[in-house]
Amino acid sequence: MSNKSRGCNYERQLVDLLHQRGFAAVRVAGSGAKPLPTPDIVACRKGKILAIECKTSRKNQVYLRDEQVDELKVYSRTAGARPLLAIKFLQQQWHFLKPSRLPRTNGSTMVVSREFISKRGMKISDLDPLVD
């Protein structure tokens, strides 16, 4: 299975988890290939919208380009959504971060480690206060 199809499967899994928590959620097909800012998942509950960019890794860190985070922020401002990053490491549950909580690094790439997300990331149940 390719990395792309594996990532799509994880996104579908997250959509299912969000549905189980009462969200109306959809995966935006081809989100990374479009010329316009588009998140991987859009989830809504009680009139509140979450724009979610997903990252998965088998390693101990994920890399995010500044432009990916900037595009998530642009989409979120336009849609009136709350931007979130959803990060999943192999053998761990999904964790969520607001872009403002991302660790800064030199250059145009941010690195989020398995340890950082375990300590600072939100669990799926922590999304409830964002939309209730």
Identify the function of each model-found stretch:
Residues 14, 37, 68-72:
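Amphipathic alpha-helical interface surfaces
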Residues 5-9, 77, 82-132:
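Domain-level recognition of nuclease-like catalytic cores that cleave nucleotide substrates
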Residues 21, 44, 75-79:
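Alpha-helix C-cap/termination motif
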Residues 1-30:
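Acidic-basic catalytic patches of nuclease active cores, encompassing PD-(D/E)XK
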